[in-house]
């Protein structure tokens, strides 16, 4: 009853009262989702304009019924500098076993072809292999297997490792949102506490490592996984839900508008990440915001040109990789480059990038002038003279662990 009374008094951003139950409202947009609300006097005016000009809406992303396993990448592993040789070998174990079995074990062959039972949307060739596995002895199939094995070796040596991990949509604790919206609770408790996430898919695991690309600073968000009767009732199965009391969105730099996290349930990587994340706090700085302009062909052109000329984040992320894989990791330099990378990402929207002070530029130029790390031979197809000599960095150590044959 209390909820219904509060619903009656709820107002939209234009001050109009709504009863969510009586009006059978199925979808609620927040102010932040309605980017151009200032240009309309009411929701009804927006609807009229929408219909008058024949506007349509499209889905950019849709939750999949089946989430395939995913792999970590070198950015996520290179930041775990406090790691032993034994731990690296154990992390690489599944990938090494796959390489060793890919030419002899039928189940491994079917898996690398995408023809095993876990894959639902098979193409014609995969269906044939699934129905008649003897095709694995065909000369064409054997040649494909050789190429697959070659790629698996490259992936292993560049830290694309097989671990228990899946990409999931990031969703906030919407129960807390309902408490705020319908009950007027200015400090809602929600279903998740600080340091907690909820993933029904990984309900058998007590802790999860939540990751996101690009992973440039130390951004391993290890959280307790809470799955109970209430979360089962209110949360959908194939997503990762985060707490409204947590700074996880600042660590992973995500918005709740279709962003995904690579959620890893491997106990070993979680132990290593927890050790390396000790005393690490999120990087935070105020970002610029562009002024409003009338949308014209000229402004669209300026925006596109800015995106192409000022948004090259690949150079910066490669410079950060050089530092992580150097003999002396300069954390302060990485922090500065991470900031520059984020300004670069937003440049097409903001048309602003900070200017380096001379002393900072001198320091960074010296560091980033180095060659790429040795494992870029496998990760980026570099030649031996384009990379540094092999050192003892985390990813470079995989070179001797992952077999060539």
Language-model-detected regions and their locations in the chain:
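Short, conserved aromatic-histidine micro-motifs
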Residues: 275-296
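Duplex nucleic acid-engaging cores and interfaces of nucleic-acid transaction enzymes
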Residues: 260
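Short active-site loop/helix that positions an aromatic residue
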Residues: 250-252, 263-279
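Conserved small-residue
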Residues: 1-5, 9-249, 269-271, 291-405
């Amino acid at each position: 009853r209390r909820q219904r009374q509060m619903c009656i008094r709820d107002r939209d951003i234009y001050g109009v009262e709504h009863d969510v139950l009586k009006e059978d409202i199925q979808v609620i947009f927040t102010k932040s989702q309605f980017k151009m609300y200032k240009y309309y006097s009411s929701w009804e005016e927006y609807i009229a304009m929408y219909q008058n000009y024949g506007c349509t809406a499209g889905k950019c992303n849709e939750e999949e019924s089946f989430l395939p396993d995913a792999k970590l990448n070198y950015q996520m592993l290179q930041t775990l500098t406090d790691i032993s040789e034994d731990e690296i070998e154990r992390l690489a174990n599944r990938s090494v076993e796959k390489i060793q079995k890919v030419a002899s074990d039928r189940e491994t062959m079917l898996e690398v072809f995408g023809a095993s039972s876990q894959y639902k949307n098979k193409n014609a060739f995969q269906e044939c292999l699934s129905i008649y596995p003897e095709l694995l002895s065909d000369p064409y199939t054997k040649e494909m297997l050789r190429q697959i094995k070659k790629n698996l070796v490259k992936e292993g040596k560049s830290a694309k490792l097989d671990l228990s991990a899946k990409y999931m949509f990031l969703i906030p604790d919407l129960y807390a949102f309902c408490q705020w919206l319908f009950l007027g609770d200015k400090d809602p408790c929600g279903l998740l506490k600080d340091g907690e996430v909820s993933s029904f898919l990984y309900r058998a695991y007590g802790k999860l490592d939540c990751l996101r690309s690009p992973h440039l600073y130390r951004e391993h968000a290890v959280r307790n996984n809470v799955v109970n009767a209430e979360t089962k009732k209110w949360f959908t199965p194939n997503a990762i839900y985060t707490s409204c009391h947590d700074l996880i969105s600042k660590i992973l730099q995500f918005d709740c508008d279709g962003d995904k996290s690579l959620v890893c349930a491997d106990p070993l990587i979680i132990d290593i990440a927890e050790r390396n994340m000790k005393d690490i706090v999120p990087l935070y700085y105020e970002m610029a915001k562009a002024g409003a302009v009338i949308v014209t062909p000229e402004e669209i052109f300026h925006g596109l040109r800015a995106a192409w000329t000022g948004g090259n984040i690949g150079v910066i992320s490669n410079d950060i990789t050089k530092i992580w894989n150097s003999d002396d990791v300069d954390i302060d330099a990485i922090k500065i480059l991470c900031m520059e990378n984020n300004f670069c990402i937003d440049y097409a929207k903001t048309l602003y990038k900070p200017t380096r002070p001379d002393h900072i530029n001198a320091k960074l130029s010296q560091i980033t002038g180095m060659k790429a790390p040795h494992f870029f031979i496998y990760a980026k197809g570099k030649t031996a003279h384009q990379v540094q000599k092999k050192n003892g960095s985390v990813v470079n150590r995989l070179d001797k662990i992952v077999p060539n044959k």
